[in-house]
């Protein structure tokens, strides 16, 4: 490396930080407020304290460009909707300041009991009950595991400045001594993230009405002293057409004409600009942020084509994953750029907002010391950037210890036997195409399965989990603290399992499940029993609102030391003569809901998990299981943002599912479950998975999702969900028979199973009992109609 350094100090910027607090203080404050145990003033006081602490922590770690307005009580897209007055009429807002009651109604609906209205896999947002108003729709933020509230627009949509939150938080920071860079979601990405209730409305046609509101708030920020404003436009890493590219030129041209002295840092992340590069470089902006973790090579084109006075924000530290950076390697990459452009035109930054990583690694006292030395959470990433800045600003000697420690950690990780297991890599290398194929085609398998299982037409089952009552959660917590012995906890769980099985028999279900009372989370339960995974105590990240998740850390080669579910399956099957499904989480879902190692391709890590699940499937079959369900709730979530990359992902994702499910005899029935709202564009991949039975979420779409399967002539069996588990409302027999008749119009009777949309973990037993009794009766009536 050249010893030449620049004399001016290099700016260190963050694009956004975790809002939840090191100990999830925001979660506690929100849930206390929602439960009526604290006041609005109490909540706002906690929020202000969290913001102040966030700014102080960044300043202390050498961040010189500190964001404001990155904080949110629920979601930054919802904040933007409120800011621009995009509040649907149903919420009763008629102008003026937007109350917290209105804000949270948009976020959560106004049903009486909101707790636990999510999907049982814990990664969905719930709908409201029929009373009150529903929440806005929620969906994934690009390809992350964060969820945003989808803006709703109508044909007569108007916008107005309804909230000055960005201005308030800028002033709040200024009063504390921090001159921040306010951050707002950019107008084009905001519109693209929304949806219209009116068919045929092009959301981008609303841009001329929206931009003046942005100009108003940006003008007020400038008047208050803001020299720079960060506008997030991650839509620039998506596939865009010429009309969408023109929208960027129109919006930013208008902003620049109205506010010529305000410097805009346009931020892009989650990928490279690709064919949108020329569009971005032609915009009248003062700075451009690039994700150089996901798209490191784009810097060359930007330097070659971009204006020489454009400030480049280099996203060189991974804002989405928890691995420590190799700082000497980064120095080698960044130094030539700084020398070429000058320190005043370069900023060092994470690749994206640090919202997607936990707050502070120092809170983890129980991690393996080697593993801990390879990790970096939000605060540590700020420190890494600060070290990099000092090394590039002539202060190399002062940070030599940090640089050496970084290099040592990277070298140790590359060679560690904790990461690399030759037996695993040898086994993965020996996988053959035959291992990803069932012995026979579906038609031959189905004949054998039907002979063996002797199920009625329209067989009834559930997706896997039953209600996790307060008693179960208390027992789990007590066991975790050591207050209940392993033996006593096991006895308690066996009792719950036995009751659930007796209850299912009484209701009349054809295919039973054991209820999953022993499982805390559908990914964590397996990760804790597989080598290559580690778990944190305080590694929380925000999923949505007050919901936080603690993703497993997939740090090394994966194998299964011993069976994970066989004991529970054998116990459950011993209590009934009816078929008991084995219940597993699929490899793609385990991968997509974890912090994944970055030293091998994701496909390699997934293949290893698939081999471990394959072993479990084989042991369940050996123990006598006739049906094994392998859930792939997150298969679709892993799709790359660019459609050109879909095939590559789907090829290996489907191969991994087939690898874990194809080692069984023809007469063993493989089930899978998926909870998505869109199948048309991946139906080929779903068919290629070749599961004998797939259960899907269809009740809210009135079975329209099945059109994709009908058009495709999908041959295998399908369980379209006949009731929405997200609502506590018990659907009538008639509602479910109506849905089944709609399903029969699209698929043959022999293909259809009858089941709820998703697992029942988050519902109460009273709701579940009423709904499943009606579901079994609906199936009985449809059998009569079909036979008649």
Swiss-Prot record:
Residues noted as binding L-methionine in the record, renumbered to the chain: 463-465, 516, 631
Residue runs in coiled coils: none
Sequence positions that bind Zn(2+): 673, 675, 697, 758
InterPro entries named in the record: Cbl-indep_Met_Synth_N, Cobalamin-indep_Met_synthase, Met_Synth_C/arc, UROD/MetE-like_sf
Binding site for 5-methyltetrahydropteroyltri-L-glutamate: 24-27, 140, 547-548, 593, 637
E.C. designation(s): 2.1.1.14
Origin: domain of life: Bacteria
Transmembrane segments: none
Keyword Transferase (UniProt): yes
Keywords: Amino-acid biosynthesis, Metal-binding, Methionine biosynthesis, Methyltransferase, Repeat, Transferase, Zinc
Pfam family name, one: Meth_synt_2
Required co-factors: Zn(2+)
Catalysed reactions listed for this entry: 5-methyltetrahydropteroyltri-L-glutamate + L-homocysteine = tetrahydropteroyltri-L-glutamate + L-methionine
Active site: 726 (proton donor)
Binding site for L-homocysteine: 463-465, 516, 631
Gene Ontology process terms (BP): methionine biosynthetic process; methylation
Cofactor note as given: Binds 1 zinc ion per subunit.
Protein purpose: Catalyzes the transfer of a methyl group from 5-methyltetrahydrofolate to homocysteine resulting in methionine formation.
Database matches in HAMAP family: Meth_synth
PANTHER family assigned to the protein according to its UniProt record, in alphabetical order: 5-METHYLTETRAHYDROPTEROYLTRIGLUTAMATE--HOMOCYSTEINE METHYLTRANSFERASE
Annotated family: Belongs to the vitamin-B12 independent methionine synthase family.
Protein name: 5-methyltetrahydropteroyltriglutamate--homocysteine methyltransferase
Organism annotation: Rhodopseudomonas palustris (strain ATCC BAA-98 / CGA009)
Upper taxonomic lineage: Bacteria, Pseudomonadati, Pseudomonadota, Alphaproteobacteria, Hyphomicrobiales
């Amino acid at each position: 490396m050249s010893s030449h350094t620049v004399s001016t100090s290099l700016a260190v910027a963050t694009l956004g930080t975790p809002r939840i607090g090191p100990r999830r203080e925001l979660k506690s404050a929100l849930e206390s407020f929602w439960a009526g145990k604290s006041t609005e003033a109490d909540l706002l006081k906690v929020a202000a304290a969290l913001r102040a602490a966030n700014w102080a922590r960044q300043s202390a770690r050498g961040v010189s460009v500190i964001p404001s307005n990155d904080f949110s009580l629920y979601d930054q897209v919802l904040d933007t909707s409120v800011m621009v007055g995009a509040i649907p009429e149903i919420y009763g807002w008629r102008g003026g300041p937007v109350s917290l009651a209105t804000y949270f109604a948009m976020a959560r609906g106004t049903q009486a009991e909101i707790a636990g209205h999510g999907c049982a896999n814990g990664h969905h947002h719930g709908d409201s009950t029929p009373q009150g108003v529903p929440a806005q729709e929620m969906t994934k933020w690009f390809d992350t595991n964060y969820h945003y509230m989808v803006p709703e627009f109508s044909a007569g949509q108007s916008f107005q400045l309804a909230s000055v939150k960005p201005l308030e938080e800028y002033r709040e920071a200024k009063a504390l001594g921090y001159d921040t860079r306010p951050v707002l979601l950019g107008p084009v990405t905001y519109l693209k993230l929304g949806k219209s209730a009116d068919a045929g409305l092009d959301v981008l046609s609303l841009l001329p009405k929206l931009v003046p509101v942005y100009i108003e708030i940006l003008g007020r920020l400038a008047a208050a002293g803001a020299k720079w404003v960060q506008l997030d436009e991650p839509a620039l890493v998506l596939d865009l057409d010429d009309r969408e590219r023109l929208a960027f030129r129109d919006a930013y041209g208008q902003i620049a004409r109205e506010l010529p002295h305000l410097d805009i840092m346009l931020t892009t992340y989650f990928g490279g600009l690709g064919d949108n590069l020329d569009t971005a470089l032609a915009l009248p902006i003062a700075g451009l942020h690039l994700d150089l973790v996901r798209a490191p090579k784009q810097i060359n084109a930007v330097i070659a084509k971009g204006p020489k006075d454009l400030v480049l924000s280099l996203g060189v530290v991974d804002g989405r994953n928890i691995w420590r950076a190799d700082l000497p390697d980064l120095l080698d990459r960044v130094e030539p750029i700084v020398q070429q452009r000058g320190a005043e035109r370069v900023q060092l930054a994470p690749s994206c907002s640090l919202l997607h990583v936990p707050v502070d690694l120092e809170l983890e006292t129980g991690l393996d010391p080697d593993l801990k030395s390879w990790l970096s959470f939000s605060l540590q990433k700020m420190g890494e950037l600060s070290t990099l800045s000092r090394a590039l600003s002539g202060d190399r000697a002062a940070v030599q210890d940090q640089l050496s420690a970084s290099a040592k950690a990277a070298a140790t990780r590359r060679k560690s036997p904790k990461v690399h297991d030759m037996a695993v890599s040898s086994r993965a290398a020996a996988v053959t195409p035959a291992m990803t194929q069932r012995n026979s085609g579906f038609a031959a398998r189905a004949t054998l399965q039907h002979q063996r299982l002797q199920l009625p037409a329209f067989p009834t089952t559930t997706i896997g989990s039953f209600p996790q009552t307060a008693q179960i959660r208390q027992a789990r917590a007590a066991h975790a603290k050591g207050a209940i012995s392993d033996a006593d906890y096991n006895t308690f769980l066996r009792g719950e399992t036995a009751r659930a099985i007796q209850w299912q028999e009484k209701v009349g279900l054809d295919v039973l499940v054991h209820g999953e009372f022993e499982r805390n989370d559908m990914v964590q339960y397996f990760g804790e029993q597989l080598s290559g995974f580690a778990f944190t105590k305080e590694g929380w990240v925000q999923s949505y609102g007050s919901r936080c998740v603690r993703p497993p850390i997939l740090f090394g080669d994966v194998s299964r030391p011993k069976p994970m579910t066989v004991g529970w399956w054998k116990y459950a099957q011993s209590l009934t003569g009816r078929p008991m499904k084995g219940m597993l989480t699929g490899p793609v879902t385990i991968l997509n809901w974890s912090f994944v190692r970055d030293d091998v391709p994701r496909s390699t890590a997934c293949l290893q998990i698939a081999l471990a699940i394959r072993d479990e499937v084989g042991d369940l079959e050996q123990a006598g299981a006739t049906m094994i369900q392998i859930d792939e709730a997150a298969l679709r979530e892993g799709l790359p943002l660019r459609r050109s990359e879909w095939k590559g992902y789907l090829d290996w994702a489907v191969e991994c599912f087939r690898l874990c499910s194809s080692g069984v005899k023809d007469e063993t029935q493989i089930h899978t479950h998926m909870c998505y709202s869109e199948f048309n564009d991946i139906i080929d991949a779903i068919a290629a998975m070749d599961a004998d039975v797939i259960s899907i979420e269809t009740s809210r779409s009135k079975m329209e999702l099945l059109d994709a399967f009908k058009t495709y002539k999908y041959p295998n069996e399908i369980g379209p969900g006949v009731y929405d588990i997200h609502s506590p409302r018990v659907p009538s027999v008639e509602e479910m028979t109506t849905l089944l008749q709609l399903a029969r119009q699209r698929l043959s009777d022999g293909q259809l199973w009858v089941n709820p949309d998703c697992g029942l973990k988050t519902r109460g037993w009273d709701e579940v009992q009423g709904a499943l009794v009606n579901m079994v009766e609906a199936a009985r009536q449809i059998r009569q109609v079909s036979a008649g």
